[in-house]
Amino acid sequence: MAETTVKEFAQTVGIPVERLQAQLEAAGLGRRDDGAALSAEDKATLLAHLRQGSPEQEEEGGGSDGSPKKITLKRRSHSQLKMPAGRDAGSRGPRQTRTVNVEVRKRRTYVKRSDIEAEEKRKQEEAEEAAAQLERALEQEEAKREEDAAEAQRAGDTAVTGGDEAEQAPSEEAAPAEEAEPSAADAEAVEESGVEVQAAEPEETAADETARAQAEALKEKPKSQQDEAKKREEERERKRAELEAKREREAEERAQRKQEAKPKKKKAEQPAGGRGAGARRGGKKRGGGTAAKQLQQEFERPTAPVVREVEIPETITVAELADRMSVKAAALIKEMMKQGVMATINQAIDQETAAILVEEMGHKPKLQRDDDVEEELLRQGEQPEGEQIGRAPVVTVMGHVDHGKTSLLDYIRRAKVASGEAGGITQHIGAYRVEGENGSATFLDTPGHQAFTAMRARGAQMTDIVVLVVAADDGVMPQTKEAVEHARAAEVPIVVAVNKMDKEDADPNRVKQELSQMEVIPEEWGGDVQFVHVSAMTGEGMDELIEAIVLQAELQELKAVKDCPARGVVLESSLDKGRGPVATVLVQNGYLHRGDTVISGTEFGRVRALVDEHGKRVNEAGPSTPVEVLGLSGLPDAGDDIMVVEDERKAREVAESRSERQREKRLAQQQAARMENLFSQMKEDEVSTINLLVKADVHGSAEALRQSLEDLSHEEVRVRVVSSGVGAITESDVNLALASEAIMIGFNVRADAAAKRMVQEHGVDLHYYSVIYDAIEQVKNAISGMLEPTLEEHILGTAEVREVFRSSKLGQVAGCLVVDGVVRRRNPIRVLRDSVVIYEGELESLRRFKDDVNEVRAGTECGIGVKNYNDVRAGDQIECYERVEVQRSL
């Protein structure tokens, strides 16, 4: 091996030169300079010296045998990194680099493992010895505590059974009790310290010098003695377990004896305080140490699901329903999705859907009604109690349009109402009170047009007698049959008035025969229906008709309660510009006074004025009296009940409740419709829609017009009435029509000045109508214009194939004779064989001799080339046809 210098060797080993020189001097090699040479023998001598140990190594933890316990090695390494240097903003050219010197220092320490294991073993043995000493102390304390507890128990039993001794026992037991408590506390402290000794390091324990000495002695014992110590430790563990079990059994027995001795204690207890009470409390502490631990309460998970009774109103939101079931809204929405219902957290659902969801979630639904206050009001008005008086009959005149209902009533009233109606047809329910020699009667005139079915149904429900007017020259018509059905549904008697008897073609027997087919049998034919022949023009039979009505009313014995809150029904409602909402009301029971608080549907208010059919203001209206009521908060629906209530606050509450319930139901229905039509809406682009906005003079007309227009909907064109209302057309109506691109229809109403200006500025489509026929017909024509036209095929002519030729230019050519009609060049054709279509296509060529022609008529021969078809045979027929677009209509 080549010799190295001291400095080179120091760099190789990784230690300072000064330290290497000191080690060489300590090894007896003398002090050497940095450049002095080191031979292989010098290095071996230095290594032997280092292995034997040196004072420096002894300081670092060298062993007594000369071998080092810990060796620390240090190394250094140098390297260079080239990094790009910064460049000025104005400079150009390649980027400069700079060199960075890097020095890495490493230090590793090696420790002798055998010494570490010996140290850990020593510490563990010391901990075991300390634990054994503490265990012995614990056993002594437990034995002492058991003796004290047994002595206290004997003293307690003596106190329970003794009479006078019970008073002396507390004072005698006070001292042992006070002594027993510290001992128990000491025992607990010992237990805690024992746990800490086992868990902590030996240096952190409270072991003293004696424990360490015993541990050292234990280390020097032979292996047999260690086995004996292990057996003794196991024996101590077993005894401690037996002692613990015995203590628990005794505690249970003491608790049972105390439970049995409770009645005796109550007899033996004397009212005493101070020391005696304290002794009793101390006795409880002594006896209940272990029992207190056993009686400690713990939370137990429910083994069965909690079933709740969930109250469900008529409409409820998803969030509220989830809250009532104590589940998360997300879980409820997930369950709804399983049921096929898509909903949001704030969406309202109906009662039936909510009940199904509650059952699916494992709870019990309880259906709840929101109209308790409303039912109370209805019960008050259903059975009015009080003095009953006779009332005038309510007579409804029904029949087909143009059969003379209003003219008949005009003659009875001596008025001209029919001439004032637009188009000469009735479009409102008219209520009139007629005074006669035989008494008074209230007549209701209903529309006969098919659009007013709801009006006729309402008229039949609120009447006592139905006068069915049938024209003698026209017979039974569709609305006549409908009127009979309404009367039967309402169980109202019918009086038939065969009108227009003054005409030459009048045939009353035909009317009787047609009505008898509907089971309306005249009295002269053995039935129970009165037939009266009348004429509204000449007045023929009017007295007989009134007599028949009076007779029918007498048979019914009509009564009404006089002294009760007034109750009636709304015949019609309209919005008057000067008077506000106006409701035409037929009073049925009680007297309606000015100033009464009334409620009708979702509207309420105080009666400001009462106006009769002649336009005069009255202070009250009795049973069977039609009257106009002013003062309601809004327009009630026709057919709604109206009743007087004493408390205006209750009326407001019921009206608001009805309005809210109606709104929620409407929202729920709209949402349900959206869900049901989810897939049909995907094809909505293919369906055209006509949006309409309807304003009418009265509620009944608006309702009839809206229903009639919506019934015009077609599978290709849908009619949607975005809004319908009562009153003049306002600026807000025009804005709504602009937003929804709707056509505005004014039925017997006009637009105000602001609305007219907006209509002219924005070009809104606005139409005025006074006859319902015209409005329906106009919309029907608009729908027909939006329908896609159909294609119909018209056969132009037929040619019979006589011979088939082959051409170099055209291929197969059929020599034909046109037997019917005309064959044109640019029209489609069909090839028929044995009257069966085998090919559909078009002509490629049509020639007469050698000339191309556009058409060939019947009886003329021609040559026909069929495009893309080469299987024409003699005897086939070539049919020429055209497709024509035909406009569809409803």
UniProtKB/Swiss-Prot annotation:
Domain tr-type G: 390-559
UniProt biased composition (Basic and acidic residues): 112-125, 136-147, 217-262
Gene: infB
Stored InterPro entries: DNA-bd_dom_put_sf (IPR009061), EF-G-like_DII (IPR053905), EFTu-like_2 (IPR004161), IF2_assoc_dom_bac (IPR013575), IF2_II (IPR044145), IF2_N (IPR006847), P-loop_NTPase (IPR027417), Small_GTP-bd (IPR005225)
Described purpose of this protein according to its UniProt entry: One of the essential components for the initiation of protein synthesis. Protects formylmethionyl-tRNA from spontaneous hydrolysis and promotes its binding to the 30S ribosomal subunits. Also involved in the hydrolysis of GTP during the formation of the 70S ribosomal complex.
Alphabetized NCBIfam families for the sequence: IF-2, small_GTP
Compartments it resides in: Cytoplasm
Similarity-based family: Belongs to the TRAFAC class translation factor GTPase superfamily. Classic translation factor GTPase family. IF-2 subfamily.
Region (Disordered): 50-304
Annotated organism of origin: Halorhodospira halophila (strain DSM 244 / SL1) (Ectothiorhodospira halophila (strain DSM 244 / SL1))
G3: region residues: 445-448
Region annotation G2: where it falls in the sequence: 424-428
One GO cellular component, as annotated: cytosol
Name of this protein: Translation initiation factor IF-2
Main location: cytoplasm
GO MF term (any one): translation initiation factor activity
Gene3D superfamilies: P-loop containing nucleotide triphosphate hydrolases (3.40.50.300), Putative DNA-binding domain, N-terminal subdomain of bacterial translation initiation factor IF2 (3.30.56.50), Translation factors (2.40.30.10), Translation initiation factor IF- 2, domain 3 (3.40.50.10050)
HAMAP family: IF_2_B
Record keywords: Cytoplasm, GTP-binding, Initiation factor, Nucleotide-binding, Protein biosynthesis
Region (G1): 399-406
Region (G4): 499-502
Binding-site residues for GTP, renumbered to this chain: 399-406, 445-449, 499-502
Lineage: Bacteria, Pseudomonadati, Pseudomonadota, Gammaproteobacteria, Chromatiales
Region feature G5, mapped onto this chain: 535-537
